[in-house]
Amino acid sequence: MAVYAVGDLQGCLEPLQCLLEHVHFNPEQDRLWLVGDLVNRGPQSLETLRYLYSLRESLVCVLGNHDLHLLAVARKKELLKKGDTLLEILEAPDRDDLLGWVRRQKLMHYDAQRNVAMVHAGIAPQWTLKKALKHAAEVEHALQDEQLYGAFLDGMYGNEPTRWDNDLQGVTRLRVITNYFTRMRFCTSDGKLDLKSKEGVGTAIPGYAPWFSHQSRKTRDVKIIFGHWAALEGRCDEPDVFALDSGCVWGGSMTLLNVDTLERHQCNCDAMGNAADGLVTRVQPGATPLP
């Protein structure tokens, strides 16, 4: 059995299918891990979600900020933003099945056999693996609890508070947890977030650094797969941290990682997020991914 992890899809179905065909993905035997941001901005959000739903028995997903935004706009359509490509999902006859499936996905996945964690954006540097899983479960519970669901989605938007505190409660607590797992790029060593900076690692403001680069990070004994940060172009200097968002929806590429061999494959994308030429490039373990 092979386990493949793929970076942000954002409604770009063609490159995903090219990658899976290239590695001869067999849903009866293999497993597909997805780092979140399954939908939005790309040309085929509805088709992508339907395709993933058809593979759900072979699939492990964690939620990204765009997936949570989808759930929020499904409740309140006025939250739709310019550039969102979610309306087709909201008007689809099978929307309840698709949205219900999204709602049941995790914020963090951990494979104990491989000692590999998967998240969308990152793990707060001050959290141990055990604490990270616990805090992810708090949000997962809110997503699946009818009494908490609406209040969580209504209150999840926002950049404050910028730092974790064990005494945080209610929606404020859930918002901070969500921001770490789905929006974080730069932070201080004790986890104070900068949610405005979105460019490459060299653009950090003084006192801040990429979440994965802090020497005091408490998950250094765990391999971590993440997406979200397209400006990294799939590059990360940390030996056990694997960045998979290579900017497919922006005309970059979509990246697939064999979780066991660490071999990468990349499919070139055009400016619309479609497979540019059907070309898939194999990148050896330890090699620098394509820009």
From Swiss-Prot:
Entry EC number(s): 3.6.1.41
CDD domains registered for this protein in UniProt: MPP_ApaH
Reactions that this protein is recorded to catalyse: P(1),P(4)-bis(5'-adenosyl) tetraphosphate + H2O = 2 ADP + 2 H(+)
Organism name: Pseudomonas syringae pv. syringae (strain B728a)
Described purpose of this protein according to its UniProt entry: Hydrolyzes diadenosine 5',5'''-P1,P4-tetraphosphate to yield ADP.
Keywords attached to this entry: Hydrolase
Similarity remark: Belongs to the Ap4A hydrolase family.
Protein name from the UniProt record: Bis(5'-nucleosyl)-tetraphosphatase, symmetrical
GO molecular function annotations of the record: bis(5'-nucleosyl)-tetraphosphatase (symmetrical) activity
NCBIfam families membership: apaH, PRK00166.1
SUPFAM superfamilies named in the record: Metallo-dependent phosphatases
